[in-house]
Amino acid sequence: MFAATRLSRLRHDTSRILSHWILPLGWLALLTGMFWVGDRSDYHRLFYILLAAPTLLYVILQPRLLRPLTGSPLFIAFLAFSSYMMLSLSWSTPENSTGSLLKRPLYIALLFFCAAILALEAPLRLKTATWLAALGAVISAAATLLRYYWDANPLRLTGYGALYNPLLSAHVYGAFTALWLAYWMQSRPILAPLPLISLALLGGLLIATGSRTPLVGLTAALMWLVLAGDRKKALIALALALAGALLGYILYPEVITQRGASFRPEIWADALRQISEHPWLGHGYDHPMRIVLSNGMLLADPHNIELGVLFAGGIIGLLLWVAIYALAFGFSWKNRKSPAVLLASTWLVFGLAAGLTEGNAFLPRPKEHWFLIWIPMALLYALWIQQRFAASRRGEDIAAP
């Protein structure tokens, strides 16, 4: 009896250390690691050590949580999509090992579970860690801009360390720009200094990258905020964004004039041609795509995440993919008055729109594409789980005599 009590106490204390200390640290490391980790492989190790392994241990210690965590409609939709993609390996010729590919949905599932555990056990720490990550992105952006202008800078800001090219920097910093847009929308004074300074620094960095992908995403995020948030502030932000775009065009006209459509119509046309060869089931997950442009350039992706899903999984895969987003946005619209939901959904809108003009990796290991898809999706999933638990407890209170 005494031994059982001690074991129960040990399990409780270990779970608390995980949920209140290690997992918040892991969440913060995931969101900020690309700013200070010099190598992408080290970023993966950070995820495995500080987030994936502790989350798995927590679920083992608290198995009662597994049923509600896996019973969410959003998680079931993700499970259906990822299972289908893993099944498609049977007719694919993947470029990576099957074992490596099979682990990727598990990593995303552990990300979901981590966010949900934090939302249930330490919601304030989840909120604080996310805010600290957003602040860290601003500090990193300021340091990156200083270094860029201090050095004999090239035409485009490429980034440093794990963010070694303009697109990677644009994806990650663009995601945090969308986050600060939502923070500004939720601040009481319209001229709240911290959000505005943050937006100015992040916006300046995005312009310096020369990438137009985040501009597409931020425009969509602003439109979402017009619909779901404070309409007056969102319209003001839209006007400021247009003014910023005009200023950017004056300072960096080559961003628009020199690169045109960057071969996107030609890329998408050839991607659709290849998709038409296997329209229903697709070519299979991780099947190589080769697109040869008219100038002889060889590309390995369609520069559109949804086309990547359609190429790999066909129409069936795309429908399962759309189901994930439909559930996420249905929940977001229904709960748009919640500041946390508005924050996460704005981030998700940014990622969805940005992915329409760049990218292909929809089930990757932890990297920049997670900032477009799976991190904001995990936040919405966590808030959904949190809401279901709160409703369940209210029902128990009402039923109690």
Swiss-Prot record:
Superkingdom per UniProt: Bacteria
Periplasmic side: 38-42, 93-103, 151-161, 209-212, 253-306, 358-368
Record note on what altering residue 264 to A does: No effect on activity. Can complement a knockout mutant
GO MF assignments: glycosyltransferase activity; ligase activity; O-antigen ligase activity
Regions of this protein lying in the Cytoplasmic compartment: 1-20, 62-72, 123-129, 184-189, 230-234, 332-339, 386-401
Region (WZY-C): 258-319
Disruption phenotype: Lipopolysaccharide (LPS) from this mutant is devoid of B-band O-polysaccharides and semirough. The mutant is also deficient in the production of A-band polysaccharide, a homopolymer of D-rhamnose. Mutation drastically affects the swimming and twitching motilities of the bacteria. Reduced number of pili and/or flagella can be observed on the cell surfaces of the mutant bacteria compared to their respective wild-type parent strains.
Keyword Coiled coil: no
UniProt effect for mutating residue 282 to A: No effect on activity. Can complement a knockout mutant
InterPro entries in the cross-refs: O-antigen_ligase-rel_domated (IPR007016), WaaL-like (IPR051533)
Reactions listed under catalytic activity: a lipid-linked O antigen + a lipid A-core oligosaccharide = a lipopolysaccharide + a polyisoprenyl diphosphate
Keyword Transport on entry: no
Keyword terms, alphabetized: Cell inner membrane, Cell membrane, Glycosyltransferase, Lipopolysaccharide biosynthesis, Membrane, Transferase, Transmembrane, Transmembrane helix
Residues annotated as signal peptide: none
GO biological process: bacterial-type flagellum assembly; bacterial-type flagellum-dependent swimming motility; lipopolysaccharide core region biosynthetic process; O antigen biosynthetic process; pilus assembly; type IV pilus-dependent motility
Primary enzyme class: transferase
Pathway per the UniProt entry: Bacterial outer membrane biogenesis; lipopolysaccharide biosynthesis
EC number annotated for this UniProt entry: 2.4.99.26
Pfam families, A to Z: Wzy_C
Notes on how activity is controlled: Activity does not require ATP and magnesium ions.
Annotated GO CC locations: periplasmic side of plasma membrane; plasma membrane
Extra information: Was originally reported to have ATPase activity, required for ligation as an energy source. However, it was shown later that ligation occurs without ATP and magnesium ions, and that WaaL cannot catalyze ATP hydrolysis in vitro.
Assembly and oligomerization: Homodimer.
Family under the similarity heading: Belongs to the O-antigen ligase family.
Protein name as it appears in the record: O-antigen ligase
Organism encoding this protein: Pseudomonas aeruginosa (strain ATCC 15692 / DSM 22644 / CIP 104116 / JCM 14847 / LMG 12228 / 1C / PRS 101 / PAO1)
